[in-house]
């Protein structure tokens, strides 16, 4: 909820909005560039809306801008039940891209399939069974090193491997012959340290291409649970269990949700 605006702002006090922040979001008030703000979609609570900007900006940037995903191309989403993964599944479904996932449990695989994933594998089982689902045109990967060699095998010719995290080691040994023979692209990507204009352009695209899909009922926030801000430590402890599907949100004022 906007409490103050600067000169020339297009927003007004009282507008229900959600925003992309570079940090500092666990606070009662934040200052944000008006170009990094979007309206809360009709029918959603503020808590639900808080779960949207970071994940949908990340997915749109990496799948649809950097990887230039085309309708019909196959996508593999590592950590498919995460906040980013759950947003990616929905966007893939909305834009005509069949997707598969790797996840941490059978329950999380079922969650992803209910959202629209075609299927996938549980990583504690046999990740190599992904070979039966390959080749993939695009892989969205927050894991990194431990999946690197597998990713090269799974990608189709001219495939794009978009690396957005390093949860599974920062170093890897790669067979560059596969990169050469299949003309593969490895794209490293970050969002938080991008400049203000880049984020403004990204949010303009989100407002045009993604936000209308909430009103159409084709996208929905995946809010696993809310915590009062005083219980932030408990929220981080739950996140650390690696059993959360979707997003956790800290709520400062219950009356505004």
Question: In which residue ranges do the predicted regions lie?
Answer:
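Glycine-rich beta-strand-centered segment in the early N-terminal region that forms part
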Residues: 1-24
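Short glycine-centered segments of the SAM/dcSAM-binding site in methyltransferase folds
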Residues: 16, 74, 98, 159-160, ...
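Adenosine-nucleotide cofactor-binding segment
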Residues: 77, 93-147, 199-201
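Glycine-rich phosphate-binding loop and adjacent beta-alpha segment
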Residues: 103, 146-218, 251-257
């Amino acid at each position: 909820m906007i409490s103050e605006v600067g000169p020339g702002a297009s927003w007004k006090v009282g507008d229900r909005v959600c925003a992309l922040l570079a940090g500092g979001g666990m606070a009662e008030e934040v200052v944000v560039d008006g170009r990094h703000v979007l309206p809360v979609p009709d029918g959603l609570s503020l808590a639900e809306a808080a779960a949207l900007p970071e994940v949908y900006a990340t997915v749109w940037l990496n799948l649809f801008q950097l990887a230039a995903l085309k309708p019909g191309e196959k996508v593999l989403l590592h950590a498919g039940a995460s906040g980013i993964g759950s947003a990616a599944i929905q966007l893939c479904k909305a834009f005509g891209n069949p997707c598969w996932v790797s996840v941490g449990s059978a329950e999380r695989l079922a969650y992803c399939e209910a959202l629209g994933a075609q299927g996938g594998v549980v990583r504690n089982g046999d990740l190599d069974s992904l070979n039966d689902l390959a080749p993939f045109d695009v892989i969205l990967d927050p894991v990194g090193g431990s999946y690197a060699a597998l990713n090269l095998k799974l990608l189709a010719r001219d495939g794009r491997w978009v690396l957005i995290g390093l949860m599974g080691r920062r170093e890897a040994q790669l067979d560059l012959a596969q990169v050469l023979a299949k003309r593969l692209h490895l794209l490293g990507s970050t969002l938080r340290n991008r400049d203000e204009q880049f984020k403004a352009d990204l949010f303009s695209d989100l407002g045009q291409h993604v936000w209308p899909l909430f009103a159409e009922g084709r996208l929905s926030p995946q809010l696993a649970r809310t915590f009062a801000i005083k219980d932030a430590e408990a929220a981080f402890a739950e996140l650390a269990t690696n059993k959360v599907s979707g997003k956790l949100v800290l709520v400062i004022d219950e009356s505004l949700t």
